[in-house]
């Protein structure tokens, strides 16, 4: 079993929130014990919202999720159109009026946890990933430039070298448009520019 609510205590000496679950897992300071497996369809950790005694709240899912960008992010409202704006608008109602020093420390901790996540472990987790991309998941109007490989992933059977795919940075994925589409957006292609990509 996995908890659906627990307590966090702020340790002023280490400037960290310590999770305490006296009911289900009976653990202190073991945040990785709270996340149910992805195979459990009736209990998933899409959102972890922490509430403080002053009525403020914040999203701390990154603190507890093992694969936030690869798995959890796809189950959240932010992946829908304007879902990110909606969630920010909702959470703004619970925002603390005056930020404390520990809020900045917590922001840095959550950003560090997200950065430490590393590469996804399977091909499907690269689809829609905010930091990494595979060429097979690009849309017809997207192109990778420059083609700087971040690593490789094996797709298919182990040991087969023809199934090795390069991993690229999501920041190197660019949207391309036809001359007509650029014209409709109020822009014009300069005569000296070369065509980078053809769509057939």
What residues fall within each predicted segment?
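Long, composition-driven mixed-charge/polar low-complexity segments
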Residues: 1-5, 10-200
